[in-house]
Amino acid sequence: MDHGVSGDLIVTDGTTEVTRFKEVIEDDSIKRIVVNVSGGTDSPLVIYFLAKFISQTKKYDKEIFPHFMVDTGNMLTIAPTLVPKQIDVIRGLFPDVTIHDVYTQDFLRKEDWHDDLQRYIPVSKEGRHFRSDLYDDVESASLDGIKNLYCEPLKKNMWEVLKPDVLLNGKTSNLPNNTLKLYGADVSQPKARAAGETEKWPQEKKDRSPWYKVDKRFIGHQYRKENLMDNLFPLTESCLVESKGELIENGLKPDAYPCKMCHQCVEKFVAFGMYDKCWTK
């Protein structure tokens, strides 16, 4: 049984098969492939397999365009410096494939920004709801952790500038709730990605998300299988905490980043045995 990548462009862990890459590679009308990236582990793996399969099939007329919408109000993230390094690693592995420089667009969630504190603050301390979370259209946001209220015009601009034939992202299904609870994450976030919910997505959304029916454990398997733990994984960042003030509000020290408590930290640890910065505890 194949526990990695089969010869027919299908990514598998021996149980679940991901076929979206095969569809994109074999569709000769698709030349310009945009991948929304976030700095985490899932989206660079999409770029990695696209590049690998383009190289494998010698379909060099296909080009990859990474697109990154940067929340400038996140005071802790170093993802804007990590993402170009992720791309360089993949370019080094597949130098014959055209992977463009990251197309970056910035935004600030003005509804959530506190001028005096110089950071984002939630509307209510208990609910941890941000004002921009309260808009109805956030439910259909195409990037997790990105507030649709401010990203919608950026996405429209991306379509006009990059003119993609197909748009992909790195969304996965969340881990099962019982697994999350074992590690202290009581709520599956975002809820639309709770285990089993992604199967209910419309086909268009599934087509944008090659990993929609797998969770982070599948991603971890591929990193190990493809020998990406030493070169690509250390360049990923997943923690959702956005400021030292938020760390303190959660009872942590101001330098306790990654927090090891948020949904993304828990999922990363379950799948990889490590948090951001390759911390193991």
Give the predicted meaning of each segment:
Residues M1-K281:
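Nucleotide-activated chemistry modules centered on ATP-dependent adenylation/adenylyltransferase
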